[in-house]
Amino acid sequence: MPAVYGARLTTFEDSEKESEYGYVRKVSGPVVVADGMAGAAMYELVRVGRDNLIGEIIRLEGDSATIQVYEETAGLMVNDPVLRTHKPLSVELGPGILGNIFDGIQRPLKTIAKRSGDVYIPRGVSVPALDKDTLWEFQPKKIGEGDLLTGGDLYATVFENTLMQHHIALPPDAMGKITYIAPPGQYSITDTVLELEFQGVKKKFTMLQTWPVRTPRPVASKLAADTPLLTGQRVLDALFPSVLGGTCAIPGAFGCGKTVISQALSKYSNSDAVVYVGCGERGNEMAEVLMDFPQLTMTLPDGREESVMKRTTLVANTSNMPVAAREASIYTGITLAEYFRDMGYNVSMMADSTSRWAEALREISGRLAEMPADSGYPAYLAARLASFYERPGKVKCLGGPERTGSVTIVGAVSPPGGDFSDPVTSATLSIVQVFWGLDKKLAQRKHFPSVNWLISYSKYSTALESFYEQFDPDFINIRTKAREVLQREDDLNEIVQLVGKDALAEGDKITLETAKLLREDYLAQNAFTPYDKFCPFYKSVWMMRNIIHFYNLANQAVERGAGSDGQKITYSLIKHRVGDLFYRLVSQKFEDPAEGEAALVGQFQKLHEDLSTGFRNLEDETR
């Protein structure tokens, strides 16, 4: 090997001199087989060829290693060198993650664009994930020299932006007695801010730590989740709730609105931080997120308006990027989410879409000549999905002070043709606890969010009962009644198609009208209007209460109006006499949350009382 070439190889960011090289024996798309790799480890990071392409070892046989390369492999030749790094694929964790956009292996795309001046990522580019030159305001906790620290202890705070405080924790595997802690001031992430001594050995720590992406970060214990993930979407919050620390799947055909729901969750949910992973989806969708999010603001409890981007991290791995990196992007995203969870934050991770990730697994599996299972996917597809979906949850964090955090995963699934029997969808549904099934027919009718209320479900309803009891003791009964009305409407639709609506009993006509109210004016929501883009939970509860109140009063009036001399109160009479109240029920969604909770609740209460009065007068008149 020429000396010049050897010198060039060691200039990438790992400054340690490497002594062991393998050489390329075979190239098949993103899969490379290298010989002379004795002593290499599974999932070890390697640099392949003259361009130092990033790769990861996924199979070992004797001294040959099979490597999946995360960049375009065109131009690789037999006998090209393969450089080992003796470490797994890891991410850098520290101040500077929020507001940034990375690719699937945590390379900062903004920095690469500035340095290369190109719209595409150059091959073999090596840029630190986090900026090493930026100075951060470091504020140590009330600890000093001689104090003991153990893994997970928070020892300082960095003011990352005006929205988020970044707590600096000791890496989980470290412990010892403090021999030095930096005074308050400005430091970069590579400056030493802490020194510990353990069994006579001193070790220095910076604000930067690395963590292998395939290894879950340790926690003290897992806890039962009991706080709802409030999304601002009525159909999700009221009928199919998730929890902070839950797992949700959004399967749906193309054009059903999966990405819009994912983005709405990122914008308006009650999470402290959001990791949005665009995995194998169109580049325009990530561009849309990059354009929209910086302009979106959220109102804090103290009245301040802050940009949503200040709590968001984007991992973009679009469909025109190398296939292998899709697999890494999901693990990169969940590791970043776990890092913020360990600070005591509630984090949401949006994976859009896990189907593309599974397709990447299928392609790599095919290149490895593994035995295919259903639809050509590998037999271990369900195991890989399960290992990803078991990483979220509500946890008690390691170290002190005592704190809890959570990671919630919302995974969009894109089954071909909207077929829910697809292997990825089937495997996902057997794992997740919340299923928000999107319906192509609803989307074609322009009913958004197009969540089908007949096939969707949530297994967290029981876990959240204590929260609902405190918030509003009537809510559980109201929700049960609303579900019954929607289910009854589905049963009646077949009869209506056969004999027509006029042949139905008066009570059934009321059921159909109430179900229409629920469908068109409660479950449907316009994400592009100021009054309906986000619906607070109190507004969702009051809207449903008034609709079900109308249903109960109308049924009661019909029953009381039925006598031996015929039906005095009919559905058409109700519609005629209380038409103005009916219009006010339809118009509830136009109430703007910006007016404040007290004003809105007052208006909803007045409508509730007016409904009772209107039906009482109707019954009195017809006696």
Curated annotation (Swiss-Prot):
Gene3D superfamilies, A to Z: 2.40.30.20, 2.40.50.100, Bovine Mitochondrial F1-atpase, Atp Synthase Beta Chain, Chain D, domain 3, P-loop containing nucleotide triphosphate hydrolases
Protein name as it appears in the record: V-type proton ATPase catalytic subunit A
Listed GO MF terms: ATP binding; ATP hydrolysis activity; proton-transporting ATPase activity, rotational mechanism
Presence of the UniProt keyword Cell division in the record: no
Function: Catalytic subunit of the peripheral V1 complex of vacuolar ATPase. V-ATPase vacuolar ATPase is responsible for acidifying a variety of intracellular compartments in eukaryotic cells.
Enzyme class per UniProt: translocase
Homology family: Belongs to the ATPase alpha/beta chains family.
Keyword ATP-binding in annotation: yes
GO process terms (BP): ATP metabolic process
Catalytic activity: ATP + H2O + 4 H(+)(in) = ADP + phosphate + 5 H(+)(out)
Enzyme Commission identifier(s): 7.1.2.2
Taxonomic lineage of the native organism: Eukaryota, Viridiplantae, Streptophyta, Embryophyta, Tracheophyta
Positions with a binding annotation for ATP: 252-259
InterPro entries (alphabetical): ATP-synt_VA_C (IPR055190), ATP-synth_a_Xtn (IPR031686), ATP_synth_asu-like_sf (IPR023366), ATPase_a/bsu_AS (IPR020003), ATPase_F1/V1/A1_a/bsu_N (IPR004100), ATPase_F1/V1/A1_a/bsu_N_sf (IPR036121), ATPase_F1/V1/A1_a/bsu_nucl-bd (IPR000194), ATPase_F1/V1_b/a_C (IPR024034)
